């Protein structure tokens, strides 16, 4: 399936990654230990590692519902978001993350609402799932503020460090989305 290449919110642009994004995505997001704490990836140690990751990201985004997140004012890449269709009409997040200095100002909510609008209205989804580490209270609050409801928790083991943690899963149906 061919997905849209760009979406916009009040303060942000969600668009496909480009090699020119290397320094901003590295400095604002990929090198951060704080940001990576609740994510499945490890921080990049240098620009060479980030360059390799950016090439993989560009290739992944060509065929998937995935974007870098850009600040409209500075044009810098500050995070990323991805969703996959796990069953016909059912989507699940593969991550929504922002650099630590961009958290707490409503950007996550803008991104999630924008993605939900696209998934429900353009892709005709019936249901969308999102998840977060149980200890990531700001992420859980953001998901609920966008209309998602707690569904269930599961134990997950991260590949990067074999840490086993509890993941809380949230869901929103097409019907719930349309009533917002």
Q: What are these language model-derived features?
A:
Residues 1-24, 28-32, 68-180:
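Acyl-donor (CoA/ACP) binding surface of acyl/acetyltransferases
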Residues 34-56:
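Conserved GNAT-fold acetyl-CoA-binding loop/helix
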Residues 29, 39, 58-61:
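Hydrophobic residues in alpha-helical segments
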Residues 34, 44, 63-66, 128:
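Secondary-structure boundary/capping residues
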Residues 55-68:
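A short helix-loop-beta-strand connector motif used in the catalytic cores of GNAT acetyltransferases and
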